[in-house]
Amino acid sequence: MEEEEKNPSSIYIVADLLEDIFLRLPLKSILISKSVSKRWRSILESKTFVERRMSLQKKRKILAAYNCKCGWEPRLLPGSSQCKGNEEIVYLHCNAAQPSFTCDGLVCILEPRWIDVLNPWTRQLRRYGFGFGTIFGVGSAFSPRHWAMGFGKDKVTGSYKVVKMCLISFSEICARDPEVEYSVLDVETGEWRMLSPPPYKVFEVRKSECANGSIYWLHKPTERAWTILALDLHKEELHNISVPDMSVTQETFQIVNLEDRLAIANTYTKTEWKLEIWSMDTEVETWTKTYSIDLENRVASRERRNRWFTPVSVSKQGNIVFYDNHKRLFKYYPRKNEILYLSADTCVISPFFENLAPLPQKSTLHTPIIAGEPNAPLTTLVVVGSIWSPLFLFSVKL
């Protein structure tokens, strides 16, 4: 009351109304608002506000790598590129050769000696050590025989997690049996925990995908059969999922997150040239064929036998954007049964949308053990962006 008498022009706005105002502001103004007061920051970083803001987005963009080996930290480049089909591409300045994963607009990049988690929208970058185990130098650190990584979100708690399955062969540790490590990093706390291994051996796996609170890997337990290895990020339990019967090869068989559902994309290249997409019902883990796209006479087929396609996103009208392993981007219109060529030399990372979820205030980087090098401590990196400009024309009581 005394404060209101001293400043009669001030206005007190209840939290619900203030949140509604923030929802209508552009991104730059929201980032500025975080520095105004603790109360505003608390509202803008709340789980409710972050989820409401994401749900209001009308259209997702496409995130592509602007490949650069300069060694600077990854960051989102200003502006965007508009291509055919009314698709918008934003570029992440990074080394495209490094393995990366995305979840809800956050990006996880595996560097040879640490893990970066980046929120491109808030310009926050957090760096973590690899936790348990040994890093075997730059040349072998990302060999599929050694590492199976994943990044996703616990749909119950909302926390983001990095998962590591480390498969070390006999020749590298001189042991009788291979040493297998299963561990999970909580991005919020920066702590690694060991997971219970599955009741079966995990051999060859492919790059992971996250969807609906789980991380999935294509797993080949035998020479002929493929299955999907699933990790529930809340229960932190592993189990197998069967795949639909189809003719597959290691190259053409892909798993993707398509509108927060796990999907399989399989490119047929022999008797017929087509792209089939199957989507999984998460509750009962059954599959439904959602697309069968005829590629014959629609896409240049000079490299047909060594070419496969990966879907990126599906619009509300059912139009699907996909790309091939030669960095060419396409869009399929089911109603017209047409394929539109969008762009070339586009290194697609994932669909992309705004996420204002805050990352922890500090990075946690433990000293990794590197073969042939002393255990020198590594520095902790925290990058937080800020923009300054006027926001409101009236005084607000905080």
Swiss-Prot record:
Coiled coil: none annotated. InterPro entries: F-box-assoc_dom_typ3 (IPR013187), F-box-assoc_interact_dom (IPR017451), F-box-like_dom_sf (IPR036047), F-box_dom (IPR001810), Kelch-typ_b-propeller (IPR015915), SCF_F-box_component (IPR050796). It holds the Pfam family FBA_3. SUPFAM superfamilies: F-box domain, Kelch motif. Residues 8-55 form the F-box domain. This is Putative F-box protein At4g17780.
